[in-house]
């Protein structure tokens, strides 16, 4: 049974953005709990995500809003958003269309570290990034 006593229900005012106005968002498959990726959100991307129910992030490399799947078609339908006890980290539970990772895998966490220190691929390749984004020059 949920107990809402003492909880400030104003979500956006509860989020503690860092000095750059960002908060980390861990993205999970809403059915399996599998971690798909980690991305950054600012207030505007979070508001857009809440409004559209499609994941929108802040691209630090491009310095602009990034609607996930906008160029690749690999959208994320948002089912749930959780906030941690400190208010400084989010979890987005999504339905992933295609791969979450820009290199083509279902999850960005597609490499497992072995006991000997080597790595192995532990996930499914969903698409060829050159076909989706074009060849890197």
UniProtKB/Swiss-Prot annotation:
Homodimer. Keywords: Amino-acid biosynthesis, Cytoplasm, Histidine biosynthesis, Hydrolase, Magnesium, Metal-binding, Zinc. Binds 1 Mg(2+) ion per subunit. Its EC number is 3.5.4.19. InterPro entries: PRA-CH, PRib_AMP_CycHydrolase_dom, PRib_AMP_CycHydrolase_sf. Catalyzes the hydrolysis of the adenine ring of phosphoribosyl-AMP. This is Phosphoribosyl-AMP cyclohydrolase. The gene is hisI. Zn(2+) binds at residues 85, 101, 108. It is found in: Cytoplasm. It catalyses: 1-(5-phospho-beta-D-ribosyl)-5'-AMP + H2O = 1-(5-phospho-beta-D-ribosyl)-5-[(5-phospho-beta-D-ribosylamino)methylideneamino]imidazole-4-carboxamide. The lineage of its organism: Bacteria, Pseudomonadati, Chlorobiota, Chlorobiia, Chlorobiales. It comes from the Bacteria. Its main location: cytoplasm.
